[in-house]
Amino acid sequence: MRRLKVEKNMKSKIIVDSSANVYQLPDVDFACVPLKILTDEQEYVDTEEVDAPALAQMMRTYKGRTSTSCPNISDWLTAYEGADEVYVVTITGTLSGAYNAALLAGEEYEQSHEGARVFVLDSLSTGAESRLLVERLAALIKAGKPFDTVCEEIRAYHEHTHLLFALESLANLARNGRVKPAVAAVARMLGIRVIGQASDAGDLEVLCKTRGEHGALERLSLIHISEPTRHSLIS
């Protein structure tokens, strides 16, 4: 009797760290691996359940030092479990060790799971741009495209995404020694907003300064219009 060859139905999964602010993704297997926010007294895990407004208010009034902690290799491996094809998007590697940890976890996962493949993309950004990449990955997977094609097309798409942002406060930067406290205080009193972008190298860099929310939105819009070939995300 002739034997029929049965091909394994490959299970795909998209995974992102919590800097993307994406905690659920419809119609695809998805996981969000949380970063942690650390103060001198407490550790906050950045999950969907965290009270973001309360945390933001605490950060505004907190006088001590704050920092973040990225997911470790074990965290990533737990998220990869059960998938044959894994697609990962991380916060820029210039700000966090999440990308390197995800890469190392991918190598370990492929070695311990025969036939598994892991693709890790450094967003070279954070926040809204990572979300854009994740949503495009989901569309490619739902279209039934093979692993190598998905990887190739998301890299090409990434070349045309761009993050612009405005900072309402410099308080956290001052607490961590990035700017002088006096500069942060003056900026707060004058209502100065810092306009920045994620550079091609993955650094978050300052473009200009403006006053007030209206001025910040106007400047962001002008920058966006000046670069029509990019899919800009304003955060």
Question: Locations of the language-model features?
Answer:
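Short, Lys/Arg-enriched N-terminal segments with co-localized hydrophobic residues
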Residues: 1-9
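Mixed-charge interfacial surface used for oligomerization/domain docking
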Residues: 9-12, 18-27, 31, 35-36, ...
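Class I S-adenosyl-L-methionine
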Residues: 42-111
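Short, surface-exposed connector motifs at secondary-structure boundaries
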Residues: 83-87, 117, 226
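A glycine-rich beta-strand to alpha-helix segment
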Residues: 90, 119-120
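N-terminal low-complexity segments that are often proline-rich with Ser/Thr-Pro
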Residues: 232-235
